[in-house]
Amino acid sequence: MARVTVEDCLIHENSRFRLVLAASKRARQLTLGHQPLVAPENDKPTVLALREIEEGKVTVQGLLDGQDVSEHLARQA
């Protein structure tokens, strides 16, 4: 898969600053051992986080509100 960029994710969030904050929070979670919600494909945590946001697996608002990813998944089910 081609690398995802911040610009690719701006359809989910208008503020580049909020998007980068959310992606960095998710990347930190992945670094600490949380399971990725997309296939890793040898990507670094920051790229995985952006891919998860771009694919709608996690939301910027949810990450910034401090919601655990498992809470987000439970509400989607």
Swiss-Prot record:
EC number: 2.7.7.6
GO MF terms, alphabetically ordered: DNA binding; DNA-directed RNA polymerase activity
InterPro entries according to UniProt: DNA-dir_RNA_pol_omega, Pol_omega/Rpo6/RPB6, RPB6/omega-like_sf
Single biological process term from Gene Ontology: DNA-templated transcription
GO cellular component: DNA-directed RNA polymerase complex
Reactions the enzyme catalyzes: RNA(n) + a ribonucleoside 5'-triphosphate = RNA(n+1) + diphosphate
Top-level class of the enzyme under EC nomenclature: transferase
Highest taxon in the source lineage: Bacteria
Pfam family, one: RNA_pol_Rpb6
Keywords on record: DNA-directed RNA polymerase, Nucleotidyltransferase, Transcription, Transferase
The protein's role, per its UniProt record: Promotes RNA polymerase assembly. Latches the N- and C-terminal regions of the beta' subunit thereby facilitating its interaction with the beta and alpha subunits.
Subunit record text: The RNAP catalytic core consists of 2 alpha, 1 beta, 1 beta' and 1 omega subunit. When a sigma factor is associated with the core the holoenzyme is formed, which can initiate transcription.
Family: Belongs to the RNA polymerase subunit omega family.
Name recorded for this polypeptide: DNA-directed RNA polymerase subunit omega
Species, as recorded: Dichelobacter nodosus (strain VCS1703A)
Biological classification of the source: Bacteria, Pseudomonadati, Pseudomonadota, Gammaproteobacteria, Cardiobacteriales
